[in-house]
Regions:
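Hydrophobic transmembrane alpha-helices of multi-pass small-molecule transporters
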Residues: 62-65, 177-182, 207-211, 283-286, ...
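Transmembrane helix-bundle signature of multi-pass secondary active exporters and lipid flippases
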Residues: 23-76, 140-147, 236-302, 322-330, ...
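Helix-loop interface residues and adjacent transmembrane-helix termini in multi-pass membrane transporters
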Residues: 35, 44-47, 81-84, 159-160, ...
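Short runs within selected transmembrane alpha-helices of multi-pass transporters and secretion channels
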Residues: 71, 140-158, 166-174, 195-210, ...
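Alpha-helical transmembrane segments of multipass membrane proteins
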Residues: 35-38, 110, 152-156, 178-183, ...
Length: 445
């Protein structure tokens, strides 16, 4: 059965939602990998192990986000060719993307294996958890090659409007991850190493499933292993879009690493509390990433078909959906977030501190929505550098400046993390201003 979707015609809000929900659910299951690790490690291995796993999050995200950005570049290029019905270019883009996944996966795996300890030490991870954190991070990076392959493969499917198959694969892999987590950590007592190995196995299963699907597809995006190679003109286009998108994603991680360094100074208990908060906070970021991916694919296909009026209508619709989700999640998590917190830890101090963070930060979720939607819209049109620049200024530079010059005068955890809503408001304002100029230049609006 053909599960691809042509975004160049049809009811916009229905198309976006039908495409969005499988991505959102898939993101939930992907997040479940690390969440299950955290729950099992926290309950079975204690607070120190929980803090060790949590302290690696920003560094792993820094690297992972870059290859996710590259996969975004591949997805945009394929979506544009798909909208333009250019079969030869689709074929070249698919095989170039897979080669890029293999090469980038190898590079990132080697980086993680050789530099994990030094990087964690540099951001101030306490020495009582440094060795465990380094072990977890090295084992996690063993999965970079299958992780890159899965992200590229699912990006190819989403580019042609298929968001359901990546969801099915993630559900299967999440089950695999939970089973191996339980066996390795709870039964065999392998600690955080067991949790990392379970994630590696799950990522490998994902990569195999998506590759098999592409190989046996009868559509224009069929993958032939013997034809995997770089097509330089297509590679250049993918990198021109994907590299800035990857850098933009890493900007968030760089800023968060700087903040994590300041958070680490408050001790192991605060690190554990923040780690739990980040897991709950991920629900919002999954929703934003899903609607961002949906609008990027939608715009990519319509840009390839030169349907500029439809692009503008799609952006407005996506923004309305994003704002609705942001407000709804803020209300739900502020009222019931404490129940989720108790899944991760039974320590009353951690539960109370985490709930305090939820009430302090989550009401401001709505202020971020313009960043995700306008960035995705511009990227779908092939403009990736300017959104990266705006994020660099509004997120990275401003957060680093805040914790360097302002928060030392307010030496509390909230004095550090208040930089999040401040930068959300600022960056959204920058995107609103620039998007008005972007519309005039690209659509004549």
């Amino acid at each position: 059965m053909n599960k691809t979707q042509d975004f160049t015609k049809g009811v916009i809000w229905k198309q976006l939602l039908f495409f969005f929900f499988p991505i959102l659910i898939g993101s939930f299951f992907q997040q479940l990998y690390n969440t299950v690790d955290t729950i099992i490690v926290g309950q079975a291995c204690g607070t120190n192990a929980l803090a060790a796993v949590g302290s690696t999050g920003n560094l792993t995200n820094l690297v992972v986000n870059f290859y996710v950005g590259l996969s975004t570049g591949a997805s945009v290029v394929i979506a544009q060719y798909y909208g333009a019905h250019n079969k030869d270019k689709i074929h070249q883009a698919v095989h170039t993307s897979y080669m890029l996944a293999i090469v980038s996966g190898i590079i990132m795996m080697l980086f993680g294996l050789f530099f994990s300890y030094q990087c964690l030490d540099a951001i101030g991870v306490p020495h009582d958890i440094l060795n465990d954190a380094s072990l977890y991070m090295r084992l996690y990076f063993l999965g970079m090659i299958p992780g890159a392959i899965y992200n590229i493969g699912s990006g190819i499917l989403r580019a042609v409007g298929d968001s359901k198959r990546p969801l099915y694969y993630l559900i299967i892999c999440s089950i695999v991850n939970v089973v191996f987590d339980f066996v390795l950590v709870v039964i065999l007592h392998k600690g955080i190493a067991g949790a990392a190995i379970a994630t590696f196995i799950a990522q490998t299963v994902c990569a195999i499933l998506v590759t098999i699907q592409l190989m046996f597809s009868k559509n224009v995006y069929q993958l032939t292993l013997s034809k995997i190679k770089f097509h330089l003109p297509v590679l250049k286009k993918i990198v021109q879009i994907g590299a800035p998108a990857g850098i933009q994603s890493t900007m968030y991680s760089i800023a968060n690493i700087v903040l994590q360094t300041h958070i680490n100074a408050f001790g192991t208990q605060t690190i554990a509390s923040w780690s739990v908060y980040v897991k709950i906070d991920a629900l919002f970021w999954m929703a934003m990433a899903a609607i961002g991916a949906a609008i990027t694919t939608f715009v990519g296909q319509n840009y390839g078909a030169h349907l500029y009026d439809r692009i503008q209508k799609g952006a407005k619709t996506a923004l309305a959906i994003a704002l609705t989700m942001a407000v709804s999640l803020s209300v739900i998590l502020c009222f019931w977030g404490s129940y989720i917190t108790k899944l991760f830890s039974s320590d009353p101090a951690i539960i109370n501190q985490c709930q305090s963070l939820i009430l302090f930060l989550m009401p401001f979720y709505f202020s971020y929505c313009c960043v995700e939607i306008f960035s995705g819209t511009m990227r779908g049109c092939g403009e990736s550098f300017k959104p990266m620049l705006l994020v660099c200024i509004g997120i990275c530079v401003l957060r680093v400046a805040w914790v360097t010059f302002i928060s030392p005068h307010y030496p509390t955890l909230k004095g550090v993390v208040i930089s999040y809503p401040i930068t959300w408001f600022t960056t959204s304002f920058l995107f609103i201003i620039y998007y008005k100029h972007f519309k005039k230049d690209h659509f004549g609006a």
